[in-house]
Structure formats: structure tokens, C-alpha cells
């Protein structure tokens, strides 16, 4: 676990984006932890979040030409991350996002920002069932570019409908590389540095049941 990943867990806890307790997920599973990106709701939060995404991208070996955020949630993520890549790593990365409604006047089209061309890295908060990724890939393909990978904040490392995680299914079915700032294993390692053994046990039990 790298230092920026430890710092990201601290950041999530401090902002209230990561909570522990009993949370019923869309899947019906009762999880001992919950990640809510809606808690990143200030300029400072967004600036910090962009830096973490940028650092994770820089720590990967993925080569891409344009960073793409899917409306609406992906718009602040792609904006903050490209600023952080420029300011922190001197990487002037083109970015774009889509419109929900195609504009027929002015510059027109369904894309705002840089033209989608070459290899595209999609940015999202989490991958739940993969619907957003399918939509993003459709937009990218329609604009003549190629989806290369996806970066998310948290990989729950949790089974989807089968024995694989949704992220594993995305990687296998679409040939995409999926990056994350942290995953569940990182979170468990972080918590083991503390003294809340009961919480660790609850997460381990949940992981034994639903983890991959």
C-alpha cells in the first residue's frame, strides 16, 4: 500500500465519504462499509480528489490520449483530474465529457472539450453494474475513438452476478484495463494498523462471503 493510498483513506474518512456500520446496497447485500462520492462537495474536496486520481494514473503504465468523463458525475472528476495532472505532474492531458442532450446549434454535437480521438481513459467513481461503462464505450466508439481503460476511486473487489467482480467482467468482456486509487484489500490493510478488531472482523466476514 503506497502513501498516497493511505492518504486517500484518511481523506475519505475526514470528508465523510467512507463510513462504517450496516448499509444495504442496491444488490440487497448488507455491507459493513459504504463509499459515497456525494460527500466530496466542496472545492477543497474536489481539488484533493483530482490529485489522488492523477497520482493513481501516474502510478499506472496505461498510455492514453484523452481523459473522458461521462455526464453528469464524471464532469467534475475529469476536470479536477486533468488540472491535477497539469499542476502536479506537468502533463497537459486533453479532456472531454458528453452532453446528455445533443446540441444542434453553435458548435453542436454531443461532446464538450477535446475531440475524442485515439485511446481514451474513462474516469468514474465506482463501477457497480457496468452500465455507465457500456454507455461511455458507445459514445467513444461513435466518435471514432477507442476505449483503452477505466479509472475509479474504489474497487470493492466484490462479486457481481457471478463469481467475478463487475470490474473483472468489464476487463474480460470489453478488454479494458481498470485502475483504482484503492481497493478493499488496501482498506483492510489500513484498518489493521488500528485497534478496531471488531470492524476488521465484520469486513473480513463480508469479504469471505462476497469477495473475489
UniProtKB/Swiss-Prot annotation:
User: PANTHER family from the xrefs?
Assistant: OROTATE PHOSPHORIBOSYLTRANSFERASE 1-RELATED (PTHR46683:SF1)
- Protein name as it appears in the record: Orotate phosphoribosyltransferase
Which organism was this protein described from?
Ruthia magnifica subsp. Calyptogena magnifica
Q: Which UniProt keywords apply?
A: Glycosyltransferase, Magnesium, Pyrimidine biosynthesis, Transferase
- Reactions this protein catalyses: orotidine 5'-phosphate + diphosphate = orotate + 5-phospho-alpha-D-ribose 1-diphosphate
A single Gene Ontology molecular function, please?
A: orotate phosphoribosyltransferase activity
Q: Where along the sequence do coiled-coil regions lie?
A: none
Q: According to its UniProt record, in which pathway does this protein act?
A: Pyrimidine metabolism; UMP biosynthesis via de novo pathway; UMP from orotate: step 1/2
Q: What is its EC number?
A: 2.4.2.10
Q: Which Pfam families match?
A: Pribosyltran
Protein residues bound to 5-phospho-alpha-D-ribose 1-diphosphate:
26, 72-73, 99-100, 103, 105, 124-132
Q: Does the record's keyword annotation contain Transport?
A: no
- What processes does the entry annotate via GO biological process terms? 'de novo' pyrimidine nucleobase biosynthetic process; 'de novo' UMP biosynthetic process; pyrimidine ribonucleoside biosynthetic process
Q: Which family does it belong to?
A: Belongs to the purine/pyrimidine phosphoribosyltransferase family. PyrE subfamily.
Assembly and partners? Homodimer.
Q: What does this protein do?
A: Catalyzes the transfer of a ribosyl phosphate group from 5-phosphoribose 1-diphosphate to orotate, leading to the formation of orotidine monophosphate (OMP).
Binding residue positions for orotate: 34-35, 128, 156
The cofactors it requires, by name, are: Mg(2+)
Q: A GO CC term?
A: cytoplasm
Amino acid at each position: 500500500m503506497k502513501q498516497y493510498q493511505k492518504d486517500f483513506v484518511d481523506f475519505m474518512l475526514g470528508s465523510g465519504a467512507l463510513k462504517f456500520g450496516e448499509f444495504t446496497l442496491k444488490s440487497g447485500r448488507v455491507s459493513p462499509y459504504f463509499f459515497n462520492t456525494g460527500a466530496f462537495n466542496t472545492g477543497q474536496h474536489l481539488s484533493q480528489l483530482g490529485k489522488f486520481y492523477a497520482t493513481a494514473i501516474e502510478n499506472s503504465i496505461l498510455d492514453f490520449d484523452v481523459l473522458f468523463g461521462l455526464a453528469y458525475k464524471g464532469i467534475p472528476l475529469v476536470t479536477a483530474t486533468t488540472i491535477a495532472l497539469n499542476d502536479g505532474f506537468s502533463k497537459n492531458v486533453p479532456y472531454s465529457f458528453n452532453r446528455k442532450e445533443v446540441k444542434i446549434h453553435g458548435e453542436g454535437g454531443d461532446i464538450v472539450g477535446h475531440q475524442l480521438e485515439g485511446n481514451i481513459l474513462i474516469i468514474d467513481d465506482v463501477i457497480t453494474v457496468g452500465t455507465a461503462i457500456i454507455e461511455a464505450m458507445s459514445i467513444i466508439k461513435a466518435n471514432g475513438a477507442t476505449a483503452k481503460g477505466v479509472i475509479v476511486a474504489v474497487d470493492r473487489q466484490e462479486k457481481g452476478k457471478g463469481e467475478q467482480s463487475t470490474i473483472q467482467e468489464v476487463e474480460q468482456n470489453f478488454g479494458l484495463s481498470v485502475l483504482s486509487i484503492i481497493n478493499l484489500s488496501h482498506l483492510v490493510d489500513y484498518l489493521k494498523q488500528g485497534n478496531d478488531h471488531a470492524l476488521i472482523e465484520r469486513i473480513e466476514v463480508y469479504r469471505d462471503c462476497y469477495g473475489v
